[in-house]
Amino acid sequence: MPFFLSYKIKSLIIGEDRAFALLSQEFSIIPGLLGEYGRKEIYRLTLNECTSDCSISFGTIFSHSDCEIKEGVYIGANCMIGKADIGKNVLIGSNVDILSGKHQHSIELVDIPIKYQKGKFKKIGIGEDTWIGNHSVIMNEIGKGCIIGAGSVVNDSIEDYSIVAGNPAKVIKKRK
């Protein structure tokens, strides 16, 4: 609870988004079972939804509190997760990035640096019973029962029960 109280105080001073980012970074580097338990508990208090039976590994950072983590979710080490709705029994490998859409940065105005241009953030849905392989980048919706091959870049929506791989990710076959 002291961490949550610290988060609430920081929220009043530096804003909720920045305070959440700092909290997520702090908890990402706590090793072992203590870290896993601590991450789960702090995210149950700060994310839109986080169930008690999820597993969030070392080095994983959430950039926004606008996330839902459903029952039975496993998130591997060193992941970066933006706005996301992660369905039941999803497996996310290590070093996976789930971006808040594929248009987080605008580039239209050449007289304004890209970092100052407003982007569009989108909550990314990941359907239940999906497995995302290591080192994948997710920028769009993934249906239920999908398998995303390691190193894939998902920039278009993926239909239910698809097996995809590559950059950009393409359907290899359907599970059903």
Feature locations, PLM:
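Conserved active-site beta-strand element of glycosyltransferases/polysaccharide synthases
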Residues: 164
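A transmembrane-helix-recognition feature enriched in membrane-embedded lipid enzymes
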Residues: 1-53
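Short conserved AdoMet
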Residues: 51, 127, 143, 157-159
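A short, glycine- and basic residue-enriched loop/turn
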Residues: 66-67, 145, 155, 161
